[in-house]
């Protein structure tokens, strides 16, 4: 659609280029979509919808700065243009400026409260703020806890048993609060801990300085001051900390691209951990981009520099494949998981082979190719380790057979899944396997057997306090009982 001759502009209409860009975006071809929207903007430079559409592409490509520029341009004439507000929030979120993103999600929600996108944006931005340095709700920055013992003249050792139980109950929250305190106070954290230890010196706290002030009052005042500053930093640090960390990460990446680190193995392990953390936390595109960048770096290294190079590349293909699967790009996901399998076979890596077969089967099952999923997962069976993996694998193969209307095979694999779950006393997989067997027996017209399995499944659902599962099983059980009486 573009003319190659120099000096000639676009050959088609604005609407055509917009439609082309939308189609390319839907197909995940974001670079080409940017080109189409850019050409459209040469025809209508201030079109708000086109600017927002190109901004969406930039977000997908990880180019948050250009995404933000386009979003702000779309708001130039109308500050309340809700699509522009949403896109500006998305761009800020991608940049890691979660507080400002939250502001624009709220503005959009106020204008268009019926749109789910703004509600979800508020939720994810708030969660990101909490996760960046710890949830504010997990740290109560008031003079309670340790300090209250001294104000009340009670030493921590004199707690009654009920208070000790309460303390244990909240120990996890306290640990998280201390971790947050370390992050916020930095070097001052050790000073705060030292002051708290001084308070436990009964002789010292009774002393007075020349001005007549008690040492205890001075120490408590100092700790209170640090807690007050921590409350302030709890709100302020996320933005500048992320900006600093982002610049540091960019510097590290640029160094890597020009000069290999002195210890490639340690660098790779650290990077893989970052990728895993990002993907586990739901930051799929961020984790995907990191994995792709690391893959570029690792491919340029020799096996002398990184002896387990192929194993690392296999891990990266696996991460990228899982991220693409989460993003709905099944074809590319399958490609990367097959690359992982290829490397695992080449290097005779049993665990990696098992992982790749697992993921390839999941892709096939997600796109409805149940026979292919079965064939792949059956190759994984000899590699399955432990009862939990076997319970899951037998169940998934059985589910595929159920989808293919091969009910006897579905029942048999359900039985194998239940046996594996019984071996490890896993109630969740006992529940899943019982439901699978009940469904298969129902389809085979073995109604009494179906009722029996549904009843067992219902018992386990109640034990697990899974209300939604209990409700669904109860309905299926009623249907099966009705069939018995007919």
Swiss-Prot record:
Swiss-Prot/TrEMBL TPR repeat ranges: 14-47, 49-81, 82-115, 314-347, 354-387, 391-424, 431-464
Signal listed as a keyword: no
Principal location listed in the UniProt entry: cytoplasm
Annotated region described as Disordered, given as residue ranges: 153-180
The entry's keywords: Cell projection, Cytoplasm, Cytoskeleton, Repeat, TPR repeat
A Pfam family it matches: TPR_12
BP terms from Gene Ontology: cilium assembly; cilium movement; determination of heart left/right asymmetry; otolith morphogenesis; outer dynein arm assembly
Keyword S-adenosyl-L-methionine: no
Cellular localization per UniProt: Cytoplasm, Cytoskeleton, Cilium axoneme
One CC-aspect GO term: cell projection
Phenotypic effect of disruption: Morpholino knockdown of the protein causes severe curvature of the body at 72 hpf. Morphants also exhibit hydrocephalus, abnormal otoliths and disturbed left-right asymmetry patterning. Some animals (17%) tend to develop pronephric cysts. At the 7-somite stage, cilia number and length are reduced in the Kupffer's vesicle. At 60 hpf, cilia motility is markedly impaired in the pronephric duct.
Record InterPro entries: ODAD4 (IPR040111), TPR-like_helical_dom_sf (IPR011990), TPR_rpt (IPR019734)
Source taxon at top rank: Eukaryota
Known role: Component of the outer dynein arm-docking complex (ODA-DC) that mediates outer dynein arms (ODA) binding onto the doublet microtubule. Plays an essential role for the assembly of ODA-DC and in the docking of ODA in ciliary axoneme.
Subunit structure comment from the entry: Component of the outer dynein arm-docking complex along with ODAD1, ODAD2 and ODAD3.
Protein name per UniProt: Outer dynein arm-docking complex subunit 4
């Amino acid at each position: 659609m573009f003319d190659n001759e120099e000096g000639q502009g676009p050959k088609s209409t604005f609407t055509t280029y917009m439609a082309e860009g939308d189609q390319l975006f839907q197909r995940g071809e974001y670079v080409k979509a940017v080109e189409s929207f850019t050409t459209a903007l040469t025809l209508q430079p201030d079109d708000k919808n086109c600017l927002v559409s190109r901004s969406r592409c930039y977000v997908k490509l990880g180019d948050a700065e250009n995404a933000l520029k386009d979003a702000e341009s779309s708001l130039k004439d109308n500050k309340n243009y809700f699509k522009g507000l949403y896109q500006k929030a998305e761009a800020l979120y991608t940049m890691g400026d979660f507080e400002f993103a939250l502001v624009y999600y709220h503005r959009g929600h106020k204008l268009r409260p019926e749109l789910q996108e703004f509600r979800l944006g508020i939720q994810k931005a708030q969660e990101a703020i909490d996760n960046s340095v710890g949830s504010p709700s997990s740290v109560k920055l008031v003079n309670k806890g340790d300090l209250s013992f001294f104000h009340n003249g009670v030493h921590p050792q004199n707690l009654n048993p009920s208070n000790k139980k309460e303390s244990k109950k909240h120990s996890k929250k306290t640990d998280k609060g201390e971790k947050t305190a370390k992050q916020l106070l930095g070097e001052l954290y050790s000073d705060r801990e030292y002051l708290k230890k001084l308070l436990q010196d009964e002789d010292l706290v009774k002393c007075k300085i020349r001005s007549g002030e008690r040492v205890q009052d001075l120490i408590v005042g100092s700790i209170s001051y640090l807690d007050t500053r921590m409350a302030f930093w709890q709100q302020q640090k996320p933005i500048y900390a992320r900006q600093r960390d982002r610049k540091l990460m960019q510097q590290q990446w640029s160094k890597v691209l020009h000069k290999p680190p002195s210890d490639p193995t340690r660098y790779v392990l650290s990077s893989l951990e970052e990728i895993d953390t990002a993907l586990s936390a739901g930051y799929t595109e961020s984790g995907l981009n990191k994995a792709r960048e690391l893959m570029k770096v690792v491919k340029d290294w020799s096996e002398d520099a990184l002896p387990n190079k192929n194993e690392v590349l296999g891990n990266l293909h696996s991460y990228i494949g899982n991220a693409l699967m989460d993003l709905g790009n099944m074809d590319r996901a399958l490609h990367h998981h097959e690359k992982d399998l290829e490397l695992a076979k080449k290097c005779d890596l049993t665990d990696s082979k098992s992982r790749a077969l697992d993921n390839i089967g999941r892709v096939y099952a997600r796109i409805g190719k149940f026979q292919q999923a079965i064939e792949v997962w059956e190759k994984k069976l000899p590699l399955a380790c432990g009862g939990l993996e076997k319970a899951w694998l037998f169940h998934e193969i059985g589910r595929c057979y159920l989808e293919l209307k091969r009910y006897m095979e579905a029942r048999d694999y359900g039985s194998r899944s239940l046996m594996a779950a019984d071996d490890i006393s896993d109630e969740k997989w006992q529940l899943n396997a019982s439901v699978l067997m009940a469904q298969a027996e129902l389809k085979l017209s073995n109604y009494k057997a179906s009722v029996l399995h549904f009843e067992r499944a219902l018992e386990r659902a109640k034990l697990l306090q899974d209300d939604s599962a209990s409700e669904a099983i109860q309905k299926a059980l009623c249907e099966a009982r009705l069939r018995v009486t007919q």
